Curated annotation (Swiss-Prot):
This is Protein translocase subunit SecA. GO terms for cellular component: cell envelope Sec protein transport complex; cytosol; plasma membrane. Zn(2+) binds at C1106, C1108, C1117, C1118. It catalyses: ATP + H2O + cellular proteinSide 1 = ADP + phosphate + cellular proteinSide 2. CDD domains: DEXDc_SecA (cd17928), SF2_C_secA (cd18803). The gene is secA.
Length: 1119
């Protein structure tokens, strides 16, 4: 017995302790529930309204204070506003904490109300209440509500997910436990609250592990209802759009009955008014990726009206392990086209790589044949030589089926592993003996392929350049150039040519490597499928097609070239975020799943989410049998077919879980040969999913499914199937993750139903080959395991679980490394998106500009004071800030840097305010006249502003400009400049960060940590980007002046929403067009069919056509 087991015996395990602490709270809920049952329907709803009013009344004073401060801040000087905004931020935090304390206090009563509402719907076909305005609105859109006179009639049946359901569910006690956990409760706090003590805590997140069939969806209604009462927004996150739509319709009436609004973002187009309204609902359902993409789209919006999301308040994630662990490695990306087109390289070099792979296959097959011959001899030296050839064959083509079969013979695998250990000694010092004879070397565990000199020779062929695919040593080549007796200009020319050659060769080598990976590591119908002439990735966890997802770094193009389908264009990232960092933005985060305990460490390390295991409502009586091990995959599949036939004859439904489309189709063909009727559910047939799952619990039904993880629909047994022994689960191999195996097992034995599960495995399975080889091989040899035999032992199960732990640890390392890289980007993203949001909304834009001016002044002072360069300072101040130095050269040399910064900053602020006042004074009379004469005709107007180099035609709302005494013009101009500058700088920065991420990986060859280099270099890139952007923005704003002097204001078309229809949209890719475009004055600007909200033009010359559209020359019109 290990130490943790000893502790558990004395103190109970963690989940038991958590549940013991929650139990008194559950008892209090049940006590209130017994009294709530006696209330009338109207009294029940009335109590909910009273609690919602209480939540708003308690924070009324704070909200009024915020309104007062927002009025005050407009009257303050720009530099004095920061203190007030900080005070507003603190009050908003106080509001959230105050509401949270109230929610904790009323939680028992609210849970009792929800439970009793569920009971009333379950026990009554209709529920009659006094109609409210909300009821009348519902009756217009939903069939389950009708209005008769002053009464609203709620029915207990409605449509959800395309099927009519009759409500028949009432919360079990275990679901109350789950609801408490999902509300993000610290159980100890509740005991203190119940006893009347004050208790404050920092809000944490919790995950409720609830077994399949235990009603996670119903349990979530408790915390969702409670938190929605604040009207701050609750997001219920699912893994696919079918579940989000179904659950919103299924649980919606429970919430709507009490006046809470419910919507689903997946029912509406991105960036539409309907989707915006969905986010304004009290409860919003949606898929994880759509929530993430809406966040990215909001941070590409050009008008406040384009924003759809509110603040990230509280989210409950269904199948949380699938979202936060399985999907966490894939970032969400919005991207656009790049100028570079290297797609043809994949087609150009495809035939060379195909030839190389075929040559290697022939070589490794011959090596295997020769190895078998030598190893059959009794001579020890010949045997040793045979092992060397066997290991070489393995390094060249580890997935060779003949090799895999031979390695399953007694003693062979163990002998090869010892040979591998010998050549790996002293950091692979002797490995060249094995690899030099190959054309390339495959590392299946790390998914890498490395070319050898022989491989390069084959690829080069008859090329004139023997080093066509060899990267030169730049350091050595640069040194050789420096030593040549030529001019400095000739040296520079040679260096440029060398760099161009290096870049071209890098691209070629990269293309070859990606093609080799595509041919050797990624198999069709396993990692991907080809549908409609497109390569589509299959999710290894769920078996679903990952619509729109593409492998990065050119790998997807390589697979497309391999499969001879159209190669889609490469893209450049415009906006990106990982699901890890998106969901960490929520103030409160909770999750539910049937399998979280094995990943509890990762949930805590990355998300600070604590896992609590909720007991089942009824004891699980499923029979989980020991794994059955076979020598070869052929024997295993034959045994599976026999097992299916036996179970079917007993009248039991059978669910066969496979890990790939290929295996599901293989088993399907084998069953067809035996004339066994069955259903197949895999990535190619996902449209029939709901129908197939609904039939899977009928007696004698056979269902083959690719990884049932996250299917979201319970398999309900017929009476005959239950009597026959329940659902039988057959796993065709162990998955890399224990969670996926547990999810498959969990499909059987729901709510106390009978059932069984067993996994069939072979020595040829990927998991066994790569991670369980040595221990299993020893076990096989000791037992004298022969072909055709089956092994069942607890020791085998333990060995397999240890192998799975190895894989899980490796995958966790990958995810954590990804997060460490993205954390660098995340801190930068937060700065940029916060500044962009301030510019878009406009409330804090003035404060941000003041801070930017200070940063620019500080940067200029530091740059020139270090060298006592007064002339340089003078030139830069005029160029960037449009001011003369407020100090003499003598003062510049003697003044401290901090004092100098303050003096120049104060002068810049004075000039900035004066410039803005000049614009207002010039334009105000024209605005007054326009408002009187055409105010009822024009809605938007254009007031061009120029910085002397470009014209910014910004559209303004005429009434708003008039009401603000033309100061709205200043704010809108600032907003236009800021948004365009931020977007341009951020896109370029993302491109540079992508390039940096790729380049720093080479640091590992120099025994340096790529992440450390990435952090240092990315900080410098970000600092330079901010400095450049600040100078560009401030330079434009400091020089801004009204362009029209003798012309009245013109009408503009209304501001348009960001048109996402122009973008190329995929699940993780989106193409965006530019927002502000410069136009030369020589182009015809007389006819403007559409006036965009923001547009930039170069300065118009005297003899150019006037931009006002009069047809006259500029000098005779508006000059």
């Amino acid at each position: 017995m290990n130490f943790s087991n000893i502790l558990s015996n004395f103190f109970g395990n963690k989940s038991q302790r958590d549940l013991n602490e929650i139990s008194p709270f559950v008892q209090k809920t049940l006590t209130i529930y017994s009294s709530v049952e006696n209330l009338s329907n109207d009294e029940l709803r009335g109590r909910t309204r009273e609690l919602m009013i209480l939540l708003q009344k308690e924070i009324e004073m704070e909200k009024n204070k915020i309104d007062e401060l927002k009025i005050l801040v407009e009257s303050l000087e720009l530099e004095d506003r920061e203190t007030v905004w900080n005070e507003i931020d603190e009050i908003e935090k106080d509001i959230i904490e105050k509401q949270e304390r109230i929610l904790d206090k009323i939680l028992p009563e609210v849970f009792a109300i929800v439970k009793d509402t569920a009971r009333r719907f379950a026990e009554n076909e209709t529920i009659e209440v006094t109609a409210t305005d909300f009821d009348r609105q519902l009756a217009v859109f939903y069939d389950f509500v009708s209005i008769q006179n002053d009464k609203a009639i709620y029915q207990n049946h409605w449509f959800a997910g395309g099927n009519e359901i009759i409500w028949n569910m009432i919360h079990y006690n275990v679901q109350l436990f789950g609801g408490i956990v999902l509300h993000n409760c610290n159980p100890k706090k509740y005991i203190k609250d119940i006893e009347g003590h004050n208790f404050s805590k920092k809000i944490k997140g919790y995950i409720a592990e609830m077994a399949t069939g235990e009603g996670k969806t119903l349990a979530a209604t408790l915390p969702v209802f409670l938190n929605a009462m604040t009207h701050n927004g609750v997001h219920v996150v699912t893994i696919n759009d079918y579940l989000s739509k179904r659950d919103s319709e299924w649980m919606g009436p429970l919430y709507m009955f009490h006046g809470l609004s419910v919507d689903c973002i997946d029912k509406h187009r991105p960036n539409s008014n309907e989707r915006r309204k969905a986010y304004e609902a009290d409860i919003t359902f949606g898929t994880n990726s759509e929530f993430g993409f809406d966040y990215l789209r909001d941070n590409m919006a050009v008008n406040p009206q384009d924003l759809v999301q509110r603040k990230h308040n509280y989210a409950i994630i269904d199948e949380v392990d699938s979202v936060l662990i399985d999907d966490a490695r894939t970032p969400l990306i919005i991207s656009g086209p790049v100028a570079k087109e290297d797609d043809q390289l994949y087609v150009l070099y495809r035939s060379r790589v195909e030839n190389l792979v075929n040559v290697q296959k022939k070589l490794t097959n011959n090596l295997l044949i020769e190895a078998k011959k030598l190893m059959a001899l009794e001579d020890p030296k010949q045997h040793e030589e045979g092992l060397k050839l066997l290991f070489r064959s393995y390094k060249g083509m580890p997935k060779n089926k003949a090799l895999i079969k031979y390695l399953s013979e007694p003693g062979i695998k163990m002998s090869m592993l010892k040979t591998e250990e010998f050549y790996m000694q002293q950091q692979n010092r002797e490995m060249y003996i094995i690899t030099d004879e190959l054309y390339f070397v495959i590392d299946e565990k790390n998914r890498s392929v490395e070319l050898t000199d022989r491989g390069i020779d084959i690829l080069t062929g008859n090329s004139d350049d023997p080093e066509f695919f060899v990267l030169p040593d730049l350091g050595t080549k640069f040194a050789e150039i420096e030593n040549e007796l030529i001019t400095k200009e000739e040296k520079q020319l040679k260096k440029d040519e060398l760099m161009q050659s290096y870049a071209a060769k890098s691209e070629r080598v990269h293309t070859i490597n990606q093609l080799l990976k595509a041919y050797c590591l990624f198999e069709k119908d396993d990692a991907y499928v080809v549908l409609d002439n497109r390569v589509m990735i299959v999710d290894e966890q769920t078996g679903r097609i990952m619509e729109g997802r593409r492998y990065s770094d050119g790998l997807h193009q390589a697979i497309e070239a391999k499969e001879h389908v159209k190669i889609e264009a490469a893209t450049q990232t415009f906006a990106t975020i990982t699901l890890q960092n998106y969901f960490r933005m929520y103030r409160k985060l909770a999750g539910m799943t049937g399998t979280a305990e094995t990943e509890a460490g990762e949930f805590w390390d990355i998300y600070k989410l604590d896992v609590v295991v909720i007991p089942t409502n009824q004891l699980v009586i499923r029979n989980d049998k020991d794994d059955r091990l076979y020598k070869t995959a052929r024997e295993k599949y034959a045994a599976i077919i026999n097992e299916i036939i036996t179970l079917r004859e007993h009248g039991r439904p059978v669910l066969v879980g496979t890990t790939s489309v290929e295996i599901s189709e293989l088993l399907s063909r084998m069953l067809n040969m035996r004339k066994i009727h069955h259903n197949v559910l895999n990535a190619k047939l996902h449209q029939k999913e709901a129908e197939i799952v609904a039939q899977a619990g009928q007696t004698g039904t056979v269902t083959i499914a690719t990884n049932m993880a996250g299917r979201g629909t319970d398999i309900k047994l017929s009476t005959k199937a239950r009597d026959a022994g329940g659902l039988a689960i057959i796993g065709t191999e162990r998955h890399d993750s224990r969670r996926i195996d547990r999810q498959l097992r969990g499909r059987s034995g729901r709510q106390g139903d009978p059932g069984s599960s067993v996994f069939f495995i072979s020595l040829e399975d990927d998991l066994m080959r790569l991670f369980a080889s040595e221990r299993i091989a020893k076990m096989m040899d000791k037992m004298g395991f022969k072909e055709g035999e089956v092994l069942e032992a607890k020791m085998l199960n333990n060995a397999v679980e240890r192998a799975q732990k190895k894989v899980e640890e490796n995958n966790f390392g990958i995810r954590k490394r990804l997060l460490e890289y993205d954390d660098v980007m995340n801190s930068q993203r937060e700065v940029i998106y916060k500044r962009r949001h301030h510019a878009l909304i406009g409330e804090r834009i003035g404060l941000d500009i003041i801070n930017m001016i200070y940063d620019v002044v500080n940067s200029i002072v530091e740059q020139y004071s270090n060298f006592n360069d007064y002339k340089g300072l003078k030139s830069e101040l005029y160029k960037t800030l449009a001011i003369e130095p407020p100090i003499s050269e003598e003062e510049f040399k003697n003044m401290k840097t901090t004092h100098l910064t303050e003096v120049i900053f104060n002068t810049s602020i004075v000039n900035f305010k004066w410039k803005n006042e000049q614009i207002v004074q010039i334009v105000q009379p024209r605005i007054e006249r326009a408002y009187k004469e055409v105010g009822n005709k024009y809605q938007n107007i254009i007031v061009p502003i120029t910085d002397g180099r470009k014209i910014y035609n910004v559209s303004y709302h005429l009434k708003t400009v008039h009401d603000t005494k033309s100061r709205e013009i200043i704010k809108s101009f600032e907003k236009a400049v800021l948004l365009s500058s931020i977007d341009e700088a951020w896109r370029e920065h993302l491109r540079e960060m992508d390039e940096l991420h790729n380049s720093v990986q080479n640091a590992s060859y120099e025994n340096k940590d790529p992440l450390l280099i990435y952090k240092l270099e990315s900080f410098n890139l970000f600092k330079n980007m901010i400095d450049t952007m600040n100078k560009r923005v401030i330079s434009i704003l400091m020089r801004g002046q009204i362009y029209i002097k003798n012309q009245e204001v013109r009408e503009a078309t209304p501001e348009k929403k960001t048109n996402y229809n122009h973008y190329k949209v995929r699940k993780d890719e989106l193409i965006e067009s530019g927002r502000i475009q410069g136009r030369t004055a020589k182009r015809d600007t007389r006819i403007l069919q559409k006036i965009e909200p923001i547009r930039v033009e170069k300065t118009v010359r005297r003899n150019d056509p006037c931009p006002c559209g009069s047809g006259k020359k500029y000098k005779n019109c508006c000059f």
